[in-house]
């Protein structure tokens, strides 16, 4: 699933090409995504100028003035800039055509993504209850420690909860816990303030490094240019079961938490 670094990389790649452009047409080939694409998407957006492109958690927010388009990439989605001569492939479900000839194309093989419209983005049900951005000053040791003290759940599911902090998916949760020296199964309420400080810093550092690497391309994700992300080449524990730890050579272990695979080093993480 595209996580915060992949979505932020997509936003950064699209924004300079699309901001200020006028949308001339929307072509919907397959409206049946996680939620049905609004049937009047083309009617509502045609002729509008894209004023800006922002991100909230794993959602992209296309600001068309009176209306905002929300896009979620789901499990397998990607947004790419294409030329008019490039034919649509099987899983290319939506095209947004702009006045300079640029086409923004949504590819989503598993169709778990979403394209929605709203006149009140901050108050939209999908956004209103989200936690702070992990790279913001609102997410720090004090905040994380307070959240941990309220819950007896394991720490990895907690930092993957978008109501606690947005955008920390499975890959980056495992990597952040490794850098903080914390096992994924440790009860959140048992973490000290110092441990929460290490973890908050690790989350920021891992996400920043992943954005710089263009995200992780494990299955379907590509950047808006069509290039792959490369963070998966530098992971310390994720998807490395039985491989030697890059720090101490202990075999990496894999466990399942909330139906998700977690990876950790039993020596480096306590």
Curated annotation (Swiss-Prot):
Task: Tell me yes or no: is DNA damage among this UniProt entry's keywords.
Answer: yes
Tell me the GO molecular function terms. Answer: 8-oxo-7,8-dihydroguanine DNA N-glycosylase activity; class I DNA-(apurinic or apyrimidinic site) endonuclease activity; damaged DNA binding; zinc ion binding
Q: Which cofactor does it need?
A: Zn(2+)
SS bonds (residue pairs): none
Q: Where are the zinc fingers (FPG-type)?
A: 236-270
Q: Name one GO biological process term.
A: base-excision repair
Catalytic activity of the protein: Hydrolysis of DNA containing ring-opened 7-methylguanine residues, releasing 2,6-diamino-4-hydroxy-5-(N-methyl)formamidopyrimidine; 2'-deoxyribonucleotide-(2'-deoxyribose 5'-phosphate)-2'-deoxyribonucleotide-DNA = a 3'-end 2'-deoxyribonucleotide-(2,3-dehydro-2,3-deoxyribose 5'-phosphate)-DNA + a 5'-end 5'-phospho-2'-deoxyribonucleoside-DNA + H(+)
InterPro entries for this protein: DNA_glyclase/AP_lyase_DNA-bd, DNA_glyclase_Znf_dom_DNA_BS, Formamido-pyr_DNA_Glyclase, FPG_cat, MutM-like_N-ter, Ribosomal_uS13-like_H2TH, Znf_DNA_glyclase/AP_lyase, Znf_FPG/IleRS
Task: Tell me which residues this entry annotates as catalytic.
Answer: 2 (schiff-base intermediate with dna), 3 (proton donor), 58 (proton donor), 260 (proton donor)
For whether the record's keyword set contains DNA-binding, the answer is: yes
Which Enzyme Commission numbers does its entry carry?
Answer: 3.2.2.23, 4.2.99.18
Record text on cofactor binding: Binds 1 zinc ion per subunit.
Positions with a binding annotation for DNA: 91, 110, 151
Which keywords describe this protein according to UniProt? DNA damage, DNA repair, DNA-binding, Glycosidase, Hydrolase, Lyase, Metal-binding, Multifunctional enzyme, Zinc, Zinc-finger
Summarize the subunit comment.
Answer: Monomer.
Q: Which family does it belong to?
A: Belongs to the FPG family.
Relate the protein's function as given in its record: Involved in base excision repair of DNA damaged by oxidation or by mutagenic agents. Acts as a DNA glycosylase that recognizes and removes damaged bases. Has a preference for oxidized purines, such as 7,8-dihydro-8-oxoguanine (8-oxoG). Has AP (apurinic/apyrimidinic) lyase activity and introduces nicks in the DNA strand. Cleaves the DNA backbone by beta-delta elimination to generate a single-strand break at the site of the removed base with both 3'- and 5'-phosphates.
**Know the name of this protein?**
Formamidopyrimidine-DNA glycosylase
Q: What is the source species?
A: Thiobacillus denitrificans (strain ATCC 25259 / T1)
Point out the gene that encodes the protein: mutM
